[in-house]
Amino acid sequence: MKVAVLPGDGIGPEVTEAALKVLRALDEAEGLGLAYEVFPFGGAAIDAFGEPFPEPTRKGVEEAEAVLLGSVGGPKWDGLPRKISPETGLLSLRKSQDLFANLRPAKVFPGLERLSPLKEEIARGVDVLIVRELTGGIYFGEPRGMSEAEAWNTERYSKPEVERVARVAFEAARKRRKHVVSVDKANVLEVGEFWRKTVEEVGRGYPDVALEHQYVDAAAMHLVRSPARFDVVVTGNIFGDILSDLASVLPGSLGLLPSASLGRGTPVFEPVHGSAPDIAGKGIANPTAAILSAAMMLEHAFGLVELARKVEDAVAKALLETPPPDLGGSAGTEAFTATVLRHLA
């Protein structure tokens, strides 16, 4: 169980250390054989090496089985050229590992429905996983360009691109509530027709998982009106970009949202939130997203589904018992982590 740890910038080192405490506790209790090494990344790497994704970090990622990432960026590096910015390091990391599927869970924890912008009765029971295709679609399609008179982009997907992200979604659904909603715009776009047909073909290999199709406009409406009906959503790059951001507001705080990026190389697990330089070093950062990212790592990189659920349950109890400041409580990073560890014991 070899992990490359990239704490990054701002609150990244603090929340990553909280996640590592949880992993170390599990390793001690379960004998996981955890081995990890810390590498500079983002702004911290720029300060040390002059680039955000330096060769020692790149090598560490290549040799690891999973990457646990904190956060990158901050005002200190805002004026740098784009090609050496902390955010470019993140894009380079994903590209180097051919990470084609982004997984973004959005869960409203029991007892915290009041945090959601939705009515409590609508928010109750929400637990949705958005699986977004990361490397194809209109963001990368050619030709693309712009003139004085017009601009153009190309929405393009190959069959293997759709098949592989669909498999990720169906495999995830098998470990959850066994229901996949595939989102497209098949009524007006040929790419949507192709997407739908290909997902259906993949779905035949998963007879235990129910498959439903929705147009993207209907899916957006249902995510707001009745989000608890969703289990796993799979969609293309641009629709996934929009729907995952829409779903991210359902729990009520970015501090609750983990993510995973999966592909051919080393998978990356990271909080959705940014580096929050305004609270860095104050000991008040909410480590929930980082701890849940570690739980996703246990599940998706190492197949330890039961341990991942154990971590999620401990976090849910800690959120009710000692909520952090961004959720209306007063528990600092260390105090909240201690509560999680107590419930894991």
From Swiss-Prot:
Free-text comment on the cofactor: Binds 1 Mg(2+) or Mn(2+) ion per subunit.
Entries under Pfam families matching the protein: Iso_dh
MF annotations from Gene Ontology: 3-isopropylmalate dehydrogenase activity; magnesium ion binding; NAD binding
SUPFAM superfamilies xrefs: Isocitrate/Isopropylmalate dehydrogenase-like
Alphabetic keyword roster: Amino-acid biosynthesis, Branched-chain amino acid biosynthesis, Cytoplasm, Leucine biosynthesis, Magnesium, Manganese, Metal-binding, NAD, Oxidoreductase
Binding locations of NAD(+): 74-87, 274-286
Pathway: Amino-acid biosynthesis; L-leucine biosynthesis; L-leucine from 3-methyl-2-oxobutanoate: step 3/4
Protein name: 3-isopropylmalate dehydrogenase
Organism per entry: Thermus thermophilus
Gene that produces this protein: leuB
